[in-house]
A protein has these predicted regions:
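Charged docking surfaces used in two-component/phosphorelay signaling
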Residues: 20-28
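Acidic, metal-coordinating helix/loop segments flanking the phosphotransfer/catalytic sites
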Residues: 36-54
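Short amphipathic alpha-helix used as the core "switch/output" element in two-component signaling
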Residues: 45, 67-78
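Active-site residues of response regulator receiver
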Residues: 58, 85
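The feature encodes the CheY-like receiver
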Residues: 62, 89, 107
Length: 148
């Protein structure tokens, strides 16, 4: 990811209208790659094919739920995840965050708020990637390239 706008975003929701609305707004905001999936199986396939930099996940999906999907994908990657769900109970939010989600936004939502949260998560991931890329490890020796 050269900039946050080069990031690949995976959007998972079973509502085709919401997929279109959010995808259009992400692209209008400058994000170049938005992959969509309407169920867990398609999401796993898209994740494997595109290796996204951010996931936006619904919870209620036709072939499972976003909680289980996140649990599965977390075994492969620590990509930032944001739940976008109509489930607004405190227990759901806490459970999702406890699984490792980085954020949780309930529907209905303000599009500008979603875009700001996406921007924040991608900026944080980008900064982390930059820090990692500036550390070189060879065997037992680690060199911080920022100090070199």
């Amino acid at each position: 990811m050269t900039t946050i706008y080069d990031a690949a975003i995976l959007l998972v929701d079973d509502n085709p209208d919401l997929l279109t609305l959010v995808t259009d707004n992400l692209r209008t905001a400058g994000y170049k790659t938005v992959c969509t999936a309407a169920d867990c199986a398609a999401a796993r396939a898209a994740f494997a094919a595109h290796r996204p930099d951010l996931m936006i996940l619904d919870i209620n999906l036709p072939d499972g739920d976003g909680f289980g999907l996140l649990r599965t994908l977390r075994t492969e990657s620590d990509v930032p995840a944001l739940f976008l769900s109509a489930r607004d109970a405190d227990a759901d939010r806490l459970f999702g965050l406890g699984l490792g989600a980085d954020d949780y936004l309930t529907k209905p939502f303000l599009m500008q708020e979603l875009l700001l949260r996406v921007q924040h998560l991608l900026q944080r991931a980008y900064r982390t990637e930059l820090r990692r890329s500036r550390v070189l490890t060879l065997g037992d020796c680690t060199v911080n390239l920022q100090d070199a």
